Swiss-Prot record:
It is found in: Cytoplasm; Nucleus; Nucleus speckle. Residues 95-178 form a coiled coil. The gene is thoc7. The THO complex is required for cell proliferation and for proper export of heat-shock mRNAs under heat stress. This is THO complex protein 7. Residues 196-265 are annotated as: Disordered. One of its GO terms (cellular component) is THO complex. It comes from Drosophila melanogaster (Fruit fly). It comes from the Eukaryota. The lineage of its organism: Eukaryota, Metazoa, Ecdysozoa, Arthropoda, Hexapoda. Signal peptide: none annotated. Keywords: Coiled coil, Cytoplasm, Nucleus, Phosphoprotein. InterPro entries: THOC7/Mft1. Residues 219-235 have a biased composition (Acidic residues). Part of the THO complex containing HPR1, THOC2, THOC5, THOC6 and THOC7.
Amino acid sequence: MSEQCQLRPHSDTLVRKLVEMNDEEIIKQRLLIDGDGTGEDRRIVVLLKQFLKWASDSLDSNPIMYDRLMAQFAQCKLTALKNVQTLQMIAGERDNYTQLVEHHEESIVLAKAEIESSKKELITAKQIRKNKMEYDLLASLIQDQPDRSETQRHIETIRREIDDLVQKKLKMERKFQKRRNDFTLLMYTIHELEQQLDQDSSSSASSSSSDCDARSEPDLDDNGIMEVSDEDDDLNNSTPTKFDGARGEPKYHSVSTEDSKAMSVEEDTVLELSIDKDEHDVDVAVAN
């Protein structure tokens, strides 16, 4: 009964607050209470009706009504505590999911940065692989080539051989020029000797003809023909006539032309033989 007396002033205050609440606030409270639609609103309405009935009754009413009110109030309180715990749990889960979202966003940003860096590393790795393949190819080609020092020695040897051959060529050219000059001089001398021999043979022939004329002069004197001295005969032979000019000079010119042709043929033959001999000497020197 003491508990009933203690709750009565509070009940009067609650009733006064409920009367003062307007319809909108009542609807908000009902929506907040009956959030999941499990009958909390009906339970509160029943509790409120019983409470108002119990408050309007006298103090000597049945205590069973009070126990029933306390039981329903405990159920409503338990439901409210459950709702509060649910709200706290939902808020905690919401904070947790918010943190997870932020964490995943940071992870996504880091993953994008890692992807970009991986792309750059991939490009660098491709370039390195390409350079390595080119290096291996060049290294294999260089490995197939002879050593630099050996190649340099071989080049120096070839240069010395080329210099020696150039010197030999110059010597052979000077030698060839000298022999050519000697050969030209020799052919000129031979030609001069041939001309002298031709002149000697012609002079001997003229002297023999003059001897024959001298032997026939006594017979001519006996027959009354003018005597001609040897000096007149020599003068006649030395003085050319128009017939001698017409017949003798072309004949001499043809002889000199034939001699020059023969001389050129012989000169070419001897020159070819000399060149062949010089080439043979050069081949022998190079082989040695």
